[in-house]
Amino acid sequence: MEQKRLTHLRQLEAESIHIIREVAAEFANPVMLYSIGKDSSVMLHLARKAFYPGTLPFPLLHVDTGWKFREMYAFRDRTANAYGCELLVHKNPEGVAMGINPFVHGSAKHTDIMKTEGLKQALNKYGFDAAFGGARRDEEKSRAKERIYSFRDRFHRWDPKNQRPELWRNYNGQINKGESIRVFPLSNWTEQDIWQYIWLENIDIVPLYLAAERPVLERDGMLMMVDDDRIDLQPGEVIKKRMVRFRTLGCWPLTGAVESHAQTLPEIIEEMLVSTTSERQGRMIDRDQAGSMELKKRQGYF
């Protein structure tokens, strides 16, 4: 079909499927990073379309910090079972032994040890040479300048000044021994595109994205949902039930909710049309320091 006859979402869908198939054909041992969020759900849906009626030719990898929302863990296992996907779960054993957690050690150290180092451990353990991620360019400024094929050296580090041109949808996947790439099939999607596609394709998502009355407290300008009894209440903090939802998901002590009454996908889409803030405004890890996301990516983050 001619491109001009495709709708905006179908053009994005076709581009993403093309990228996923290219990587599966080019690389010896790819993997799909599965963080359980809305972007991961869309990426998995696209991958299933890309190889239908066959099964995925690569596994899913979840780097577990031990601090995800309980609903996320339940959704992860349910999804993998429903689709017959091979699911690999890796948790940094050194971090577990040290008792690393976001309350005691802070967001920067927790993220570095449990996510960045955990990811690098898993990639090395299984020898993956390409890893799909659900990052989008509209999310954050360092991601805006990252290529679809994001090359990493043998230490998994990203050099933003040493990126390859990507002209006419041609991607250069040649790598040397020990090197790898991170692949972002959703690079050109926006948050609004993601939600419209989820509605169009009836994609299952974690219920936390929909507004409901949940136990939250205010801390550091963020609405923190109290998901289990590991909460470390500070003087003056009070847990209250409020109507909230999440625009992005991560470790529950580091992910802020937003007040909302959007309980359906059309209501979320309508809410996004008038939103003037980034979906990552509630991610504590983005506040560590100026340029913190780029620094994390240089060190091997997603």
Curated annotation (Swiss-Prot):
Its EC number is 2.7.7.4. One of its GO terms (molecular function) is ATP binding. Pathway: Sulfur metabolism; hydrogen sulfide biosynthesis; sulfite from sulfate: step 1/3. Keywords: ATP-binding, Nucleotide-binding, Nucleotidyltransferase, Transferase. It catalyses: sulfate + ATP + H(+) = adenosine 5'-phosphosulfate + diphosphate. CDD domains: Sulfate_adenylyltransferase_2. Gene3D superfamilies: HUPs. GO terms for biological process: hydrogen sulfide biosynthetic process; sulfate assimilation. InterPro entries: PAPS_reduct_dom, Rossmann-like_a/b/a_fold, SO4_adenylTrfase_ssu, Sulfate_adenylyltrnsfr_sub2. Belongs to the PAPS reductase family. CysD subfamily. With CysN forms the ATP sulfurylase (ATPS) that catalyzes the adenylation of sulfate producing adenosine 5'-phosphosulfate (APS) and diphosphate, the first enzymatic step in sulfur assimilation pathway. APS synthesis involves the formation of a high-energy phosphoric-sulfuric acid anhydride bond driven by GTP hydrolysis by CysN coupled to ATP hydrolysis by CysD. Heterodimer composed of CysD, the smaller subunit, and CysN. This is Sulfate adenylyltransferase subunit 2. The gene is cysD.
